Design a protein with these regions (language model features):
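C-terminal alpha-helical cap of glycosyltransferases
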Residues: 248-268
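Acidic donor-binding loop of glycosyltransferase active sites
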Residues: 179-190
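Active-site and donor-binding regions of nucleotide-sugar-utilizing enzymes
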Residues: 1-109
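Conserved catalytic-core segment of nucleotide-activated headgroup transferases in glycan assembly
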Residues: 95-167
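Short, well-ordered alpha-helical microsegments
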Residues: 35-38, 90-91, 135-139, 162-164, ...
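Catalytic binding pocket for nucleotide-activated donors in carbohydrate/polymer assembly enzymes
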Residues: 55, 78-79, 97-105, 164-170, ...
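Structural motif
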Residues: 29-33, 84-87, 128-133, 156-159, ...
């Protein structure tokens, strides 16, 4: 019904035509080991181009698309080299079975430690709703009695999936992204990278656990944060403490490494 197979075939056709026309020596892209990327690697390798995948998103729990065991031809459809945004990504890929000689840390420009900030225990709880409306339903149902008891919440819908609910003096919607909200006590999230963003900012975070549905944890494997269902939510919000993981998720850019892999002839 989604015509995904046709879209992937068309994408592969366009990639093949582009590689034939441009004849690049090196190709690099934000890599997540999806089906189209595996085919792109095969086509690029046939054209003689060196392939470099950049691990830009987190390698979190249950993100098995990163595993080379899901590639029908194993390492043959993996990039020649994978540059990671930080130590957490590298460790995650190694744990999934990626060959160590294909992985290096390239760092990232997307985050700086000076973005870390303090929480304000008197400020509202920032609620980041996921794309899944059923999970969003559960989150609103869980926080509404807390709001009725006097705790304040601001609720941000997923940017692609607006969520409608009735505002109250202590439960209000916001269009502001996390970084644009001046004062926050705790961030409550489920299945959205806003949770990771909050951890990187050093804010207290609680991951909401829905009933009967899988809510993918976007935080890299090995990092722990409080999690709670509706029954335990009040206690979890009251006891949440800040954790700063930015230096492990995103390393400083290693420009020398990027220079070597993108322009190998100029560094010999």
């Amino acid at each position: 019904a989604t015509a995904q197979a046709a879209a992937l075939r068309w994408q592969a056709h366009c990639a093949e035509r582009w590689l034939a026309a441009c004849r690049p020596a090196v190709v690099v892209w934000p890599w997540e080991n999806h089906a189209w990327e595996r085919q792109f690697v095969r086509i690029a390798r046939q054209s003689g181009a060196r392939t470099i995948g950049y691990q830009h998103a987190t390698v979190a729990q249950r993100e098995w698309n990163y595993s080379p065991k899901t590639n029908s031809d194993g390492e043959k459809s993996l990039p020649d080299l994978i540059l990671c945004s930080g130590a957490a990504g590298k460790d995650g890929l190694l744990a999934l079975g990626h060959p160590a000689d294909r992985i290096r840390i390239g760092g990232a420009l997307r985050w700086k430690n000076n973005c870390v900030r303090s929480s304000d225990p008197t400020a509202p709880v920032y609620v980041a709703l996921p794309a899944d409306h059923l999970i969003a339903d559960e989150m609103i149902v869980a926080i509404r009695p807390l709001a009725e008891a006097g705790q304040t919440f601001v609720v941000k819908s997923h940017p692609m999936y607006p969520y409608d609910f009735t505002d109250t003096p202590t439960l209000q919607r916001t269009d502001a992204n996390l970084a644009d909200v001046e004062a926050i006590s705790v961030v409550l999230y489920a299945a959205t990278t806003v949770g990771l963003e909050a951890l990187l900012q050093g804010l207290p975070v609680v991951r909401f656990i829905p009933q009967g549905r899988v809510s993918v944890d976007v935080v890299p494997t090995g990092f722990k944060q409080p999690a709670a269902d509706a029954a335990n939510l009040s206690r979890a919000l009251d006891s949440a403490e800040p954790t700063n993981i930015s230096d492990q998720v995103f390393a400083e850019p290693d420009l020398e490494t990027w220079q070597k892999v993108l322009f190998p002839s100029s560094t010999n």
